[in-house]
Amino acid sequence: MSKQYSVQQQIALTQAAIKKTAAWWRARPLPDALRQCAASHGVTLDAALVLDLQLAWPDMPAVYGKLLSPDGHFIHFEMDLDDDLRPLPGSVAWDDISARYDLAAHKRGKGARYGELCKQVLQELNRSAR
């Protein structure tokens, strides 16, 4: 029989997973092409929260994923790279997908939603980085 978690336990587990992913990406170098693309959109990756980053899977863009910008926007990005690891012209996508995330601080029976938990983790990590 699987263990049933309370809403508070589920929230704590989700928040811990978000922190773990964010800390993992903050501890590793991100592709220069992604840094440059983010900078061109006014996003400093050192203060952003990388939620997902995939690199060079067959039949997929060379770099793609999701992040939460320092100003609270959820972004989906993707780009193909040339042999010098620069974005190929016309291959860069940078889309604000914030509308897809529920930012409710509390929903009856469900607690804080994923988008709100991401924002809390972003604030916590950026406070501790100062």
Enumerate the language-model features and the residues they cover.
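Hydrophobic alpha-helical membrane-spanning segments
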Residues: 29-46, 66-68, 72-75, 80, ...
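Low-complexity, intrinsically disordered/propeptide-like segments
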Residues: 16, 37, 48, 52-54, ...
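Context-gated lysine
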Residues: 3, 19-20, 66, 107-110, ...
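Canonical pleckstrin homology
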Residues: 98-130
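Anionic N-terminal interaction surfaces
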Residues: 1-64
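Phosphoinositide-binding peripheral membrane targeting modules
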Residues: 51-109
